[in-house]
A protein has these predicted regions:
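Bacterial Sec-dependent N-terminal signal peptides
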Residues: 1-28
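Short hydrophobic/aromatic-rich motifs at helix boundaries and adjacent loops
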Residues: 16-18, 27, 86-91, 103, ...
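Residue-level signal for pocket-adjacent positions within structured domains
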Residues: 19, 51, 127, 169
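Short, contiguous alpha-helical
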Residues: 34-38, 42-45, 53-94, 133-176
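Acidic/histidine-rich alpha-helical segments that form the ligand environment
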Residues: 47, 100-133, 139-154
Length: 176
């Protein structure tokens, strides 16, 4: 009987340790992601800041988005995808791109990053791991979070190419 109790006590302690370490690991992973998210926000704002006002409407091709549209698209997609797939509510802000100044666009993008961050942080671990259909694919909300990071990186990279074509040295990449 004593051996059985010792075994059960040990098994319970191991199970409890595994449960706690899993929860800590999930939180650490999310914290690391959010740290990188803030880095992405700052880098995007730095890219926007580098473009002179005269280059905001520059397009690499008539069918392409302008620099201003690329940057707007980063923020607008964050808001839309966060609302549609990450359980985000009304962000409480919008922008009229046609009349927006560079400062207005920077404020919009900053708020978009903050809104998406708050939406992601509000997801429970169960919600983050839930599989949902997104653009015809069955993915978890964690994968949608990664999609937002990839999407912003893609369009920020395009914006950096626009800077170079305009003869502007882009900001240095900061990984962390």
């Amino acid at each position: 009987m004593k051996n059985t109790l010792n075994f059960l006590s040990s098994a319970l302690m191991v199970a409890l340790f595994m449960l706690i370490s899993t929860a800590v690991s999930a939180q650490t992973t999310r914290d690391e992601f959010m740290s990188k998210w803030q880095n992405s926000k700052q880098f995007t704002l730095d890219v926007l800041d580098k473009m002179p006002d005269s280059g905001m409407d520059y397009k690499t091709d008539p069918a392409a988005m302008s620099f201003k549209e690329q940057i707007h698209h980063i923020g607008n997609a964050m808001v839309g995808i966060s609302q549609g797939y990450l359980k985000g509510g009304d962000p409480g802000f919008t922008i009229d791109l046609a009349t927006a100044s560079k400062a207005d666009l920077a404020a919009f993008v900053g708020k978009s990053y903050d809104y998406a961050a708050a939406t992601m942080k509000a997801l429970s671990d169960a919600d983050a791991g839930e599989s949902i259909e997104v653009f015809g694919n069955n993915v978890t909300r964690r994968q949608v979070m990664a999609l937002l990071m990839d999407h912003s990186t893609h369009h920020r990279g395009s914006a950096i190419a626009y800077l170079r074509v305009e003869g502007v040295e882009p900001p240095a990449f900061v990984g962390f």
